[in-house]
Amino acid sequence: MHQIERAAAVEQKKLLTNLLPHEIAERMLKGENRIADEEESVSIFFSDIIGFTAIAKHCSPVDLLSELDEYFSIYDTLALKHGIEKIKTIGDAYMAVCGIPKKVDDHALRMANFAKDIVKASKEFTFNGKHIEIRIGIHSGPVIAGVIGLQKFAYDLWGDAVNIASRLESTGKPNSIHISNDFLESLTKQMGEQPASVSMGETMLKNRGAMQTYLLQMD
């Protein structure tokens, strides 16, 4: 009986760590069943593939999933390299965060380096034999994070900062990193100097109005 219980516990831990961030899985395994955290400053990342719907029309379902899996595996590898937490993928979109659930003081710097590596890798990637272009949006601000679901757990983020990052992505330029002034200020503070960027002036963001934004320059 004890062996069965131990095996079940091992399987439960394996399942949770595959679904949730390590820190969150550990808390749930210790009996914490309502996880809701708040962090005042994190960096949130969104990206998507430009014209993906048209690209997908020329792929079989098997080829489409195979290509997406290969492509997002690059993201996952780079996220691990830079200490970025993947939140989810939705179709061709990728959402990630730095600064929660593990608090770090250099979340903007980590995210900037991650985004630059993503742009470089994406330029070299071919989807169904064709090169792709992506948009990236990044914002720094406060979020609420937690686990929802009874049988199928999901770790997610909520807050205005999430919406802003998403809007920055959708209004971005091809193969560029579209950032908010809040992210630029956080990055400048963490670098000790202002990074190279190009002002986009005031960008109209849906449900937010005009916001000063920038394109972060590649190294």
Label every PLM stretch briefly.
Residues 148-159:
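Short, surface-exposed loop/helix-turn segments at secondary-structure junctions
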Residues 23, 50, 142-143, 182:
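Alpha-helix/helix-capping structural signal
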Residues 6, 10-14, 26-110:
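Catalytic NTP-binding/metal-coordinating core of nucleotidyl cyclase/transferase enzymes
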Residues 1-9, 18, 22:
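Interdomain signal-transducing alpha-helical coiled-coil linkers
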Residues 66-84, 100-136, 140, 160-173, ...:
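Alpha-helical scaffold within the catalytic cores of cyclic-nucleotide enzymes
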Residues 143-145, 171-219:
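Cytosolic regulatory/linker segments at or just downstream of nucleotide-handling modules
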Residues 20, 47, 179:
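A conserved hydrophobic position in a structured secondary element of the catalytic/binding core
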